[in-house]
């Protein structure tokens, strides 16, 4: 199997130096190169261009992509979060760009696999997605009505938002107990990270089994990188130390 080109390796090294981005190189049990690219879903235009060049160097790509038609409230969350990203891009005057995931999905060459497709969505993720939708459904009106926040008729909304805010303090405990099957009950939002980490790792294994000869890049949110790497290492993958890219020395005059 052909290795990733030196040019693509150098671009990946450049991605790893971008703020809030990460690149982890792994070797699958059969010796295949797999690069995990962790990104922010909204980024500076220059960062987006670098990530695009990195992804274009692969003919096999896997992406994080919440399955809206399978997840409770997915039909609400997807459009709302997408609208927020688009609004940020517009308000930045073109200085911000969207996710590399969308770039990968739109590439005409090669294969892009949505890794989170599954026959059965775990219950924890269903509850977590519904809970996130509840946060969005209450927080957005609260922000829009902020100028009238002192009005008595808004008191129930204020109480609900504060209650949800207090419950966020349970996230660290839920994350610490993430390996327990009941850990997500403490704070369902943790499943947006942990349960999806597991789905992503399983999707990567399926993708490599279906396409057994090509190196691959996997694009996920930056927060998913540690959990996905941990799960792949448990499946026999090996983490590769990043190569040092040496540039020619500049001769002084």
Outline where the language-model segments fall.
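Compositional signal for N-terminal targeting/processing segments
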Residues: 1-253
């Amino acid at each position: 199997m052909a290795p990733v080109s030196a040019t693509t390796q150098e671009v990946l090294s450049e991605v790893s130096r971008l703020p809030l981005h990460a690149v982890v190189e792994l070797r699958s049990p059969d010796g295949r190169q797999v690069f995990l690219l962790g990104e922010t879903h909204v980024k500076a235009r220059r960062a987006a261009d670098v990530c695009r060049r990195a992804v274009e160097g692969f003919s096999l790509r896997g992406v994080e992509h919440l399955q809206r038609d399978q997840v409770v409230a997915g039909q609400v969350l997807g459009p709302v979060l997408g609208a927020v990203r688009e609004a940020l891009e517009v308000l930045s005057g073109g200085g911000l760009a969207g996710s590399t995931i969308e770039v990968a999905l739109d590439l005409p060459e090669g294969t892009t696999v949505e890794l989170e497709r599954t026959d059965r969505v775990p219950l924890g993720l269903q509850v977590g997605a519904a809970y996130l939708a509840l946060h969005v459904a209450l927080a957005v009106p609260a922000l829009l009505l902020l100028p009238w926040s002192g009005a008595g008729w808004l008191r129930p909304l204020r109480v609900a938002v504060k209650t949800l805010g207090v419950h966020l303090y349970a996230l660290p405990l839920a994350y610490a107990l993430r390996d327990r099957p009941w850990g997500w009950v403490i704070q369902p939002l943790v499943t947006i990270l942990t349960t999806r980490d597991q789905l992503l790792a399983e999707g990567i294994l399926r993708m490599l089994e279906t396409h057994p000869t090509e190196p691959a890049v996997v694009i996920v949110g930056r927060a998913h990188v540690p959990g996905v790497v941990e799960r792949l290492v448990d499946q026999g993958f090996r983490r590769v130390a990043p190569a040092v890219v040496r540039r020619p020395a500049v001769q002084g005059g």
